[in-house]
């Protein structure tokens, strides 16, 4: 169970980082 929770948190963290970088690039292109 703990392994599944750690894997879920890792995937969520990576998704948050990639989405943040994508939003940052989009905002830079809009400027």
Swiss-Prot record:
Plastid is among the record's keywords: yes
Annotated signal sequence range: none
Keywords, sorted A to Z: Chloroplast, Electron transport, Membrane, Photosynthesis, Plastid, Thylakoid, Transmembrane, Transmembrane helix, Transport
Topology class, membrane: Single-pass membrane protein
Entry coiled-coil feature ranges: none
Biological process according to GO: photosynthesis
InterPro entries registered for this protein in UniProt: Cyt_b6/f_cplx_su6 (IPR007802)
One Pfam family linked to the record: PetL
GO cellular component: chloroplast thylakoid membrane; cytochrome b6f complex
Positions of transmembrane segments: 3-23
Domain of life: Eukaryota
Cellular localisation: Plastid, Chloroplast thylakoid membrane
Quaternary structure, from the entry: The 4 large subunits of the cytochrome b6-f complex are cytochrome b6, subunit IV (17 kDa polypeptide, PetD), cytochrome f and the Rieske protein, while the 4 small subunits are PetG, PetL, PetM and PetN. The complex functions as a dimer.
Family: Belongs to the PetL family.
Role according to the record: Component of the cytochrome b6-f complex, which mediates electron transfer between photosystem II (PSII) and photosystem I (PSI), cyclic electron flow around PSI, and state transitions. PetL is important for photoautotrophic growth as well as for electron transfer efficiency and stability of the cytochrome b6-f complex.
The name this protein goes by in its record: Cytochrome b6-f complex subunit 6
Organism: Phaeodactylum tricornutum (strain CCAP 1055/1)
Phylogenetic classification of the source organism: Eukaryota, Sar, Stramenopiles, Ochrophyta, Bacillariophyta
Gene behind the chain: petL
């Amino acid at each position: 169970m703990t392994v599944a929770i750690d894997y879920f948190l890792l995937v969520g963290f990576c998704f948050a980082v990639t989405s943040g970088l994508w939003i940052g690039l989009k905002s830079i292109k809009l400027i």
